[in-house]
Amino acid sequence: LSYYIDPKDPKESKEESIFFRKDKFNAELSFGAKQIVTHFEEENIAFSALSKLADFETERKLSFYSTTNDPQKVAQENRKTLYPGFNKDRRTYLKSLINKFSEHKILVFEFIETWNKKEKANINGFYLTPSTIVLKRQKSYRREIFTLIHELGHYLLNIEEIDEIIGDDYTTYEGLDKI
């Protein structure tokens, strides 16, 4: 059903239509992860259809960037608009970041995985075009903040298949998932 109500043309890609922050770099998605992704893809399509029917503006407010841009300049530009101000309480800081993102039409959702689920998701977050970020609820707010900012990078680049661009050069950073 969602295929027929989606107003966008089908995207031709060898990979999935989204980019994930997984537990391990270049890992295969588990069945649980695929279920969560499918659920949020359907929610994203439904939201897109409803926003068109309700004349709700979902235009992107932030600029598009590429991997050739100077990362420091990009960070400085976007910090002015997206940085809510630091708060020592990480939960409050995460909430203020999400609120600031919503002011710029970036939707942030969170999924909670129960301890007794048979097929667990092996992703910490993912980005869906045009403006949806999905995070896995973590015990550590620091890790959720890291994943949120990571996915913001994909939003700013507007590139979902970035794995193909960066390749295996970043396998040395596999330990980052321990944060």
Ranges and model annotations:
Residues 1-179:
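Short juxta-domain linker segments that transition from a proline/glycine-rich
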